[in-house]
Amino acid sequence: MFRFRALGSVSFAALLAVPEVVLAQPAELPSVTVQAPGQRRPDIATVAGDRSGTKRAKRASAKPVTSTVADKPLTNALGTYNPALDLPGLKLPPGTTLTTAGPVDGYRALSASSATKTATPIEQVPQSIQVIPRSVITDQNNVTVTEAIQNVSNVQGTNTLGIGTTGSFGGMTVRGFSAQQYLDGLNNMYNVGDRDSLVNVERIEVLKGPNAILYGGGAGSPLGGAINVVSKLPTDKASLETGLTLGTKSYVQPYFDVNQPLSPDKTVLFRFTGDYTSNNTFVDVVHQDRYSLNPTLTLTNKEDTTLTIQGRLSRLEQQAYQGLPAVGTVAGSFRLNPDLYIGPSSIPKSYSDVKSVTATFDHRFDPIWSFNIKARWADQNADQRSQTTLSAAPDFPPTTWSLQNIEVLQMQREISVNPNLEARFRLGPTNNVWLTGADYSRVTDRSHMNADLGVLPVDLLNNPVFPTPYTDPSPASPTFFSYTDVDSVYTTKGLYTQLQSTIYDRLHVLAGVRLASINIDYVENYPFSLGVFSPTQFGSDTTRALPRFGAVLDLVPGLSVYGSYSEGMQASTFVQALNTNVQPETSKQAEAGFKFNINDQLTGTVAAFDIRRQNVPVVIGLGVGALSAQESKGYEADLIWQPTRNWKVIASYGHTDVRYSDSNTGTPQGNRVPGVPEDSGRFWVDYSFDWPALRGWSAGAGVYVASSQYVDNFNLYKTPGYFTVDAKIAYETEHWRAAFNVKNLTGEKYFVPFTWLGGQVARGDGRAFYGTLSYRY
């Protein structure tokens, strides 16, 4: 067990020792950078002032530099009407950069839309929301979304060796429970295609805990949290960035980002991003090829109306990886080769792809009223082929496992629509933002899990050879078996209203309610599917009011306390044969904590939470064994420290105790939910040199630490804790950037739980080197 709790106590004590908070006074001119997409970040030498309040050495003396109040609308600063910048009165620290997703000060995003669906300062949201801006992704040279979200406490990403869908099982988790990944505020059900591409990512917003008020679509509203990936959008300044990343295991990734106004008056804007990645992995046989293409067209009158149309074409191909059995890796008296790929090397590649179109229309009627509507059509497919083991321990001791050829095919079509009406107004001593809206989503899901049982067993320890070739299971074969063959339709509808009020500029209250409806039609077609012996139809239709409320109280300038309560509801997917009237999952969260901002240098959130979840499907072997109740309790801290423009520090720590609170699945009450470290944390520091001889150079290093995790529901197997160290050095000019990164610098060897059929683990990536060279104007 790592000594995280002591570390948290030391951090808290250090916080209390910080000198008295000083309220920043308005400066004469706003030190704000309006940055084109491909433009170099502000050079340290050109920033109006230092966070310490004075210019640096060899510069003329100046008055202390302080925050600037945005007394003029920012909504048109980037050449379009952009509601993400509708932040009147927001204090902008010197050097703030305006992006299409909101203002950013170094590593710190000043606002976010994911928590309220309105542009809101993060310090006024009574819930933990963390933002990973583009500046962090660039400095750390993150190569996957999973790597980027490790900067946030109590968040675990999808294993990058996995392929296929990541719905209820095997996806991202927040505070110990499954979290849904959203794309630009709309559901991204199953998250297929190249889900780790970062070329089109402006920022990643992580909202912790259920938030049914604002999020529906797919199978329903998130239960553990929402991870909203915010895309890059066009601006009115032409720019280009193109680059190439090379790395360990034949890693090759060319990428581009082109932003170009198409009309002389800059009312027609276009942006196109894309990348292609080819790499081997640290597992034998597995080779990945993936690409992502993202064209975006914006039509705007530059004052109060904008229409944006986003396209997405993304695909991932690789040999399906199933992990390794727990016995022989983290348990048992023998050790398998951690690089072993189970299955013949000639196995055909699996694939996961998505094609989608998203349209967003924004219009401001007057200074009070505005309207927004989003709509998306998506075509998503995944075909996963494997020769797989079925158990964590040998079927034929001491070291031989039985195998099956298994194909999991899924085809989804999704349509989502989400209109919103917003009003901003003053009433007596209050500033108010009222939001009302509706959403509708329909997902059709055609899927099967077919097997061929006629595969010879293999000794996985002693020079394993796989004599039976992989072939797609066919009903014509005498050894064919279908575990599941279903047609599903998930229809979600919701009406919601929300009021945000700031009272006497000190108390920030949020309250809302959603009337949510989830309709599930589930048809099991194959007569011998798991637990079903004739074609059978399941379904449920549930309507429920889901509240959310909370408040932030500013104790003194720069220090606030907050508390909140929220609920979520989601369809219980993949619950074949359990019940003909399966009720949706539900969750309830209570959260309390404090937020601080000390002179725009040390900022962060410290929180404690309690989440209770009902009707949770639990995978046991090849199917869902039962519906369980689970509870997650814990605490966390997310800090950013930027004492000067040279230094940028991220520190996060989370403690999560997530357990089964009943024994309906056959697991003892009190067992821990697998795949969740009890303690985890991230620390990263970056330094930019401004000495004349080293100007343009920067260096950084960090560490990620996670404690042990259970592999299975019965808590029989457990992976040890581990840590990884990464480092980078970079050189940047106005047009060129070169960076060199090392990940897992110490070559730590470790395993993590891998969601497959229960009882599997995956090896962690070894030491890897990456070099990136890019050009921009």
Where are these predicted regions, by residue range?
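Acidic, small-polar-rich N-terminal luminal/periplasmic segments of exported/outer-membrane proteins
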Residues: 37-237, 592
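Outer-membrane beta-barrel translocator/receptor signature
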Residues: 200-202, 212-295, 301-305, 355
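Acidic/polar loop-and-plug regions of large Gram-negative outer-membrane beta-barrel proteins
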Residues: 277-281, 293-364, 377-412, 456-484, ...
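Structural signature of Gram-negative outer-membrane beta-barrels, strongest in the C-terminal barrel
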Residues: 300, 412, 431-443, 486-613, ...
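Face-selective signature of the C-terminal outer-membrane beta-barrel domain
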Residues: 357-380, 404-524
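Membrane-embedded beta-barrel scaffold of Gram-negative outer-membrane proteins
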Residues: 362-376, 380-388, 561-562, 584-661
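Gram-negative outer-membrane beta-barrel transporters
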Residues: 505, 610, 626-713, 772-776
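C-terminal beta-signal and adjacent terminal beta-strands/loops
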Residues: 704-712, 730-777
